[in-house]
Amino acid sequence: MKKKLVVLGLLAVVLVLVIVGLCLWLPSASKEPDNHVYTRAAVAADAKQCSKIGRDALRDGGSAVDAAIAALLCVGLMNAHSMGIGGGLFLTIYNSTTRKAEVINAREVAPRLAFATMFNSSEQSQKGGLSVAVPGEIRGYELAHQRHGRLPWARLFQPSIQLARQGFPVGKGLAAALENKRTVIEQQPVLCEVFCRDRKVLREGERLTLPQLADTYETLAIEGAQAFYNGSLTAQIVKDIQAAGGIVTAEDLNNYRAELIEHPLNISLGDVVLYMPSAPLSGPVLALILNILKGYNFSRESVESPEQKGLTYHRIVEAFRFAYAKRTLLGDPKFVDVTEVVRNMTSEFFAAQLRAQISDDTTHPISYYKPEFYTPDDGGTAHLSVVAEDGSAVSATSTINLYFGSKVRSPVSGILFNNEMDDFSSPSITNEFGVPPSPANFIQPGKQPLSSMCPTIMVGQDGQVRMVVGAAGGTQITTATALAIIYNLWFGYDVKRAVEEPRLHNQLLPNVTTVERNIDQAVTAALETRHHHTQIASTFIAVVQAIVRTAGGWAAASDSRKGGEPAGY
């Protein structure tokens, strides 16, 4: 009897241990690991729910492109101030099977009735129908899906249709943008209809529903991209833009095509290759920054002592200044011959010549960097990074330009339209720097404006992805992307630190180095000793999403500056 009780007791103990073990193990299959390192696949978007939607697409057997599209459709709701189907995007895609990278260009174009001198003030180019360029977002999704999609097109829309209908709590990024644009939104009934409660803008945590956009997503899911460009949604889109004073026509939409770029810009940094878009995006600017800096052979030691750290950051800022001086020569290659400019900006010899002009003890006046022209700042944006189970990756940056784009929202379709026309240079709009506007970036029908976006994928010699990275934040995008790469690749910071580490930014015009509030005082002191004008950023500098290959799997980071969080499995 005693023996029987002992056996039963042991069995009970074993059973308890098994149950406890299962309880501990089972959630880990569905629960996110706290360190955001995933063994098989990862998505880093700027909203947690959107990272999860992307992850679920991967779990359902979707490709990296499927996950990116599903997540972007979600970001267009949850961070509607940054991006959406009324905007445009660029995708850098790496296929692990073929070991080839490609870029899909779905940036907006100037309408066919546009002309170089159409704007006399920034007010016109930033707000209202005239500031709207022909949206490319949905054509971009379509081309990417045709080439790399595994899941049905409609499946990619389903989670976001549900989200838009049921509503969701306003997140950190959207809440900040609503507060920033409070006056405009509260005065405009069509915007206030969705973004206000009791005629006051929604605050973080309050519920936002987007029923009209849910209907539009449903139409696109069923009818495909054609619905937007040459189908059931087209007439209303044109009507909405023209009612707000715009010049986009049905013909503009009918004629819009996303472009496949089979040989994207690439540069080598030691044993890795970086793939990124060329002009009119800022891949060449990123390439020049990194090529200038690689000659310094940065390592962990470069930031060990306050003296070394100060010198290192000074050199980084000087590289920014030289690269941004050359940025003003870039434009849409279909309209301007930028071959030689891009060749120079990606040449190690050219970078070495500029590096030789960097003085370690001082910065220089603006004229020293030889800026030939001035290009306007670009706006917000959203970035996401994806790595799928097969090792393929997508780096996607999407935008409607400034917060809430043109502020033109359709009461029927719910689409919020871009103000991408503001990214062009205008001969008649002067700037305070006394530098002429850039002719390479003047408006022409069908032309794409210059952008700071640079979605990047880094690949090792073994053909495996090492890093997927990009940023949002207007003109600060390129420097923030460069810093994330420098922090991880050269300083050896893990991905979380590479994304969270305080940043600084200098674009030559204005002649100021902006630093984040929490940056190391030694850095600011070293810059000021070298005659840099520093100022503290009013909020933060850009928003980065990155995924890095580590020994333990895919380490993913979504920038806390916008309140995002990655997902994976």
Swiss-Prot record:
Residues 1-4 are cytoplasmic. The active site is at residue 381. Glycans are attached at residues 95, 120, 230, 266, 297, 344, 511. Heterodimer composed of the light and heavy chains. The active site is located in the light chain. Changing residue 147 to Q: No effect on gamma-glutamyltranspeptidase activity. Residues 27-569 are extracellular. GO terms for molecular function: glutathione hydrolase activity; leukotriene C4 gamma-glutamyl transferase activity; leukotriene-C(4) hydrolase; peptidyltransferase activity. The keyword Cell inner membrane does not apply. This is Glutathione hydrolase 1 proenzyme. It is linked to Glutathionuria: A very rare, autosomal recessive metabolic disorder characterized by the presence of glutathione in the urine, due to generalized gamma-glutamyl transpeptidase deficiency. Most patients manifest mild to moderate intellectual disability, and behavioral disturbance. Seizures, tremor, marfanoid features and strabismus are observed in some patients. L-glutamate binds at residues 107, 399-401, 423, 451-452, 474. Cys-454 was thought to bind the gamma-glutamyl moiety, but mutagenesis of this residue had no effect on activity. Its EC number is 3.4.19.13, 2.3.2.2, 3.4.19.14. The gene is GGT1. It comes from Homo sapiens. One of its GO terms (biological process) is peptide modification. Detected in fetal and adult kidney and liver, adult pancreas, stomach, intestine, placenta and lung. There are several other tissue-specific forms that arise from alternative promoter usage but that produce the same protein. It is a single-pass type II membrane protein. The chain crosses the membrane at residues 5-26. N-glycosylated on both chains. Contains hexoses, hexosamines and sialic acid residues. Glycosylation profiles tested in kidney and liver tissues reveal the presence of tissue-specific and site-specific glycan composition, despite the overlap in composition among the N-glycans. A total of 36 glycan compositions, with 40 unique structures are observed. Up to 15 different glycans are observed at a single site, with site-specific variation in glycan composition. The difference in glycosylation profiles in the 2 tissues do not affect the enzyme activity. It is found in: Cell membrane.
